[in-house]
C-alpha cells in the first residue's frame, strides 16, 4: 500500500472512530433538537401536543416513548456519521493539497484563509452526495414519536428507506438536498476553515495544548452551527414531506418552505432547537480534538 493510500485510510479511520463515540454520547440532545425543529411539520404531533421547549421535550420523551427512545435514530446516525465525518476529514486534506499547495500562511493570509474555506466546504458537499439518504432516514426515525410498533411510522432504518423509496422513488430520499448543500458548505467552511486557520496561526500548530485546541474547536462549532442553522431547519422540514400526498404536502418547494416558516411562525422558528444544537456542538468540538489526538497514535 502506498504512503498516500495509508494516509487516506488513517484519516478515514481516525475521523470515523472519533465521530461514532461522540455522536452516541450526544444522541439524546440531537433527538430533542430534531423534534423541536420538525414538530410543526409532523403528522404525528398535533398543535396542542407540540413541545414547548428543550426542558418540556426532555421531560416528556421518556414518559411518552420510554427512556431508550432518546437514542431513536442513533444507529442510523452512527452508520451515517462514520462515512460522513471520515470522508469529510479525509477529503479535507486532499482538497487542502489542491487549494493550498504552495501558499504561505504568514505571507498570504487571505489566500490561506480562502483556501481553507474552499477545502472545508468542498469536503462537506462531496461527502453529502454519498450519505444523504442515511441522513434523511436518521431525521425521519428521530422525528417518529409513536410509542409501540403499531404507533410508529417506521420500524427501523431499512423500513424507512424502502417505504419512502416505494412511495416517492429516489427523489424522496433526497428531499431537501439543494438547501442541504448550501447549508453544509457554509457550516463546513467555517468548521474546518476557521479551525485550521486559527490553529495554523499558532506558533507551533503541531503541538497545541488539548485545552486550547478544544476552546478553538468549541467556538468554531458554535458559530458555524448558528450561521447555518436556518438552512438545517428548512432541509429537515423538507425531509418531513417525503411520503406525503395531496393536501398533506405543506411546502411546494424550498423557497416556499423559507417563505411559509417566516410568514406563519416568524423568524425565530428558523432557530428552534438552536440552543440544544450549541450543546450538541460540544460533541462536534470534541470530535475535532479527538481526531487530532487519534492521528498522533495511528
UniProtKB/Swiss-Prot annotation:
It holds the Pfam family Mito_carr. GO terms for biological process: adaptive thermogenesis; ADP transport; mitochondrial ADP transmembrane transport; mitochondrial ATP transmembrane transport; negative regulation of mitochondrial outer membrane permeabilization involved in apoptotic signaling pathway; positive regulation of mitophagy; regulation of mitochondrial membrane permeability. The modification N6-succinyllysine is found at residues 147, 245, 272. Under cell death induction, transglutaminated by TGM2. Transglutamination leads to formation of covalent cross-links between a glutamine and the epsilon-amino group of a lysine residue, forming polymers. Residues 1-7, 100-109, 200-210, 292-298 are mitochondrial intermembrane. One of its GO terms (cellular component) is mitochondrial inner membrane. The modification N6,N6,N6-trimethyllysine is found at residue 52. Gene3D superfamilies: Mitochondrial carrier domain. The keyword Transmembrane applies. The modification N6-methyllysine is found at residue 52. The matrix-open state (m-state) is inhibited by the membrane-permeable bongkrekic acid (BKA). The cytoplasmic-open state (c-state) is inhibited by the membrane-impermeable toxic inhibitor carboxyatractyloside (CATR). Proton transporter activity is inhibited by ADP:ATP antiporter activity. ADP binds at residues 80, 92, 235. It is a multi-pass membrane protein. The modification S-nitrosocysteine is found at residue 160. Residues 235-240 are annotated as: Important for transport activity. The modification N-acetylserine is found at residue 2. Detected in heart muscle (at protein level). Detected in heart. Its main location: mitochondrion. The modification Phosphoserine is found at residue 7. Residues 38-74, 131-178, 232-273 are mitochondrial matrix. Solcar repeats lie at residues 6-98, 111-201, 212-297. ADP:ATP antiporter that mediates import of ADP into the mitochondrial matrix for ATP synthesis, and export of ATP out to fuel the cell. Cycles between the cytoplasmic-open state (c-state) and the matrix-open state (m-state): operates by the alternating access mechanism with a single substrate-binding site intermittently exposed to either the cytosolic (c-state) or matrix (m-state) side of the inner mitochondrial membrane. In addition to its ADP:ATP antiporter activity, also involved in mitochondrial uncoupling and mitochondrial permeability transition pore (mPTP) activity. Belongs to the mitochondrial carrier (TC 2.A.29) family. This is ADP/ATP translocase 1. The gene is SLC25A4.
Amino acid at each position: 500500500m502506498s504512503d498516500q493510500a495509508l494516509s487516506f485510510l488513517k484519516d478515514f479511520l481516525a475521523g470515523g472512530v472519533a465521530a461514532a463515540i461522540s455522536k452516541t454520547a450526544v444522541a439524546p440532545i440531537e433527538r430533542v433538537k430534531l423534534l423541536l425543529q420538525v414538530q410543526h411539520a409532523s403528522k404525528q404531533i398535533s398543535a396542542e401536543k407540540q413541545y414547548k421547549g428543550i426542558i418540556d421535550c426532555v421531560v416528556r420523551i421518556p414518559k411518552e416513548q420510554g427512556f431508550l427512545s432518546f437514542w431513536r435514530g442513533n444507529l442510523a446516525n452512527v452508520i451515517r456519521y462514520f462515512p460522513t465525518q471520515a470522508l469529510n476529514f479525509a477529503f479535507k486534506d486532499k482538497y487542502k493539497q489542491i487549494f493550498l499547495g504552495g501558499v504561505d500562511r504568514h505571507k498570504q493570509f487571505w489566500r490561506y484563509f480562502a483556501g481553507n474555506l474552499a477545502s472545508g466546504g468542498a469536503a462537506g458537499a462531496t461527502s453529502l452526495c454519498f450519505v444523504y439518504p442515511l441522513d434523511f432516514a436518521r431525521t425521519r426515525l428521530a422525528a417518529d414519536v409513536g410509542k409501540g410498533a403499531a404507533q410508529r411510522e417506521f420500524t427501523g432504518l431499512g423500513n424507512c428507506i424502502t417505504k419512502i423509496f416505494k412511495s416517492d422513488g429516489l427523489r424522496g430520499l433526497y428531499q431537501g438536498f439543494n438547501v442541504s448543500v448550501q447549508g453544509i458548505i457554509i457550516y463546513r467552511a467555517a468548521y474546518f476553515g476557521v479551525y485550521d486557520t486559527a490553529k495554523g496561526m499558532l506558533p507551533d500548530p503541531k503541538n497545541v495544548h488539548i485545552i486550547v485546541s478544544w476552546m478553538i474547536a468549541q467556538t468554531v462549532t458554535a458559530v458555524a452551527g448558528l450561521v447555518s442553522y436556518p438552512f438545517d431547519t428548512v432541509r429537515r422540514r423538507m425531509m418531513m414531506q417525503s411520503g406525503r400526498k395531496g393536501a398533506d404536502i405543506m411546502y411546494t418547494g424550498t423557497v416556499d418552505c423559507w417563505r411559509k416558516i417566516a410568514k406563519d411562525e416568524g423568524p425565530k422558528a428558523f432557530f428552534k432547537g438552536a440552543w440544544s444544537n450549541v450543546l450538541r456542538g460540544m460533541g462536534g468540538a470534541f470530535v475535532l480534538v479527538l481526531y487530532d489526538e487519534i492521528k498522533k497514535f495511528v
